[in-house]
Amino acid sequence: EDNCKLKFLELKKRIFRFIIFRIDGQQVVVEKLGNPQETYDDFTASLPADECRYAVFDFDFTTNENCQKSKIFFIAWSPDSSRVRMKMVYASSKDRFKRELDGIQVELQATDPSEMSFDIIKSRAL
């Protein structure tokens, strides 16, 4: 998980827009890194339709007072079509893994894309 922490620190420095993590055997590994130009749509398109993942996304937005801000989201992606055993593994490991990533501001759990739409992300950020 050291590499996960390292990449997360780089995301906080705005080197990456997002990171997708997967559980490989007993450990969490980095599966994909999104460059700063990538959008939220690029990010959601990178999540598999039928497998669980953890992800962090650095969300830039404008407040109602017209201030530019960003918030780091932790997303637990657990689609309905994924295997029950994997859902349980991801659910039981989530809090421990999330604690390793210092600086997460918003947590979101999603079982289908509508639960993590751009509008939902924006409303949770404000």
UniProtKB/Swiss-Prot annotation:
GO molecular function ontology, one term from the record: actin binding
Residues in ADF-H domain copies: 1-126
Family: Belongs to the actin-binding proteins ADF family.
PANTHER family documented for this protein: COFILIN-RELATED (PTHR11913)
Protein's name in the database: Actin-depolymerizing factor
One BP term from GO: actin filament depolymerization
Tissue specificity annotation: Preferentially in mature anther.
Organism: Brassica napus (Rape)
Domain of life of the source: Eukaryota
GO cellular component terms given for this protein: actin cytoskeleton
Function text: Actin-depolymerizing protein. Severs actin filaments (F-actin) and binds to actin monomers.
Pfam families on file: Cofilin_ADF
Keywords for the protein's UniProt record, in alphabetical order: Actin-binding
